[in-house]
Amino acid sequence: MTDYTKDMLYYSENKGLGSEKFNYKFSPIKERKRILYGVCGEGVGHAIRSGVVIKHLLEKNDVTTFAHGRAYHYLRKKFNNVYQIEGFNTVYESNKVNSTKTLLNGIKDLPQDLMNNLTAMYDIAKTFAPHIIISDFEFYSNLLSKILRVPLISLDHTHVVTHCENKVPIKYLKDKLKAEGVVRSFIQLPTIYLITSFFYPPLTNPERVKIFPPILRKEIFELKPENEEHILVYQTSDSNLKLIELLKEFDYNFIIYGFYKEEIDGNLSFRNFNEVGFFDVLASSKAVITNGGFNVISEAIYLNKPIFSMPVKKQFEQILNAIHLEKLGYGEFHDDPDKADLEKFLLNLDIYKKNIQSNFVHDGNHAILQELDVLIEELTTKSSQINTVNKAKIT
């Protein structure tokens, strides 16, 4: 457990949020297990992945979800028992993470968010009595698992940063070390790490870490890829104005998401995000231009779309995705692309497409969802046995 988390737990205990103060008691395990799910709200990738998992879990379990930001708004439209909390947000400027502003904003909001979130989450958890907590890189559900002593499952892509062996160019070493520190401070000592990824570096601790293909939506599986003349552009933030000027130099039609507007500017068509519309554009696109976000890259790869990746600077997870994307031959990675870079990419689309078709394999989410079902059964059975033994000792 990191010093940061110890401080947070100490703070919660001294503010009356300890497990003894809460008088938390576990209910006997019934046929349907009760799962509390925490979802990070940075971008929509965490929400999209969690949406698939939650839908699966609800077939045999009861699920209560806590999420912030865009994840909350996405999930509340799809499920009941979704509650809003506050969370950490990254500040972007000119397609670059502003680490100073991100840190200062987080420090400023943390004391109030800590109190409000843990109080609200515990009030609901006291009634719901979860047997297991699952976190898709959500900080407060991680803390709650420690306070309540409920088994924690980490399920995300983010831990590929800390729990896989990643060799990167020296110029990204500082970003790597910083990212590792942040990731380790968010989630501590879960029972197991389930990592989703389109690349498979060696695991640092195979006994507690398992890696699976990306979790994809049913709608993606149902799409029929075509090869029309437009190129899809998706941006994590609307700060990359340099890219917009670059695209104007080409004869292609670019359909652009991430700038929060509906507008046509020459060969550029800006669109607000709409799931159905996005699916259609993605499936029929010639290629995809994006940052290094895991979800869009994974969906594009599944649909055999070559990818031109410009990861947000200082965002190491995106940088790592882009490095492996290029290494696998699925597309190209550029920090600061110019016209020649994009021209080269467009000339080699057939090569990248063949590489994807030859090498990428997906199992329809079967392995990871099956693993999750087994884990839930094992952990709840073990928890029930421990509670029975403890009760016998008391009597």
Region locations from a protein language model:
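C-terminal amphipathic helix plus adjacent low-complexity
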Residues: K344-T395
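A nucleotide-sugar donor-handling region in carbohydrate enzymes
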Residues: G18-F22, H163-C164, P169-D238
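A donor-sugar binding/catalytic signature common to diverse glycosyltransferases
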Residues: I132-D136, S154, D280-L320
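Catalytic binding pocket for nucleotide-activated donors in carbohydrate/polymer assembly enzymes
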Residues: V296-I297, I301-K353
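Donor-nucleotide binding loops and adjacent catalytic segments primarily
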Residues: I54, I215-A287
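A short, glycine/small-residue-rich beta-strand->loop->alpha-helix junction that serves as a flexible
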Residues: G38-G51
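Conserved nucleotide-sugar phosphate-binding/catalytic loop shared by glycosyltransferases and other
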Residues: E31-R34, C40-G41, T64-Q112
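Conserved nucleotide-sugar donor-binding subdomain of glycosyltransferases
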Residues: S99-I132, F139-Y140
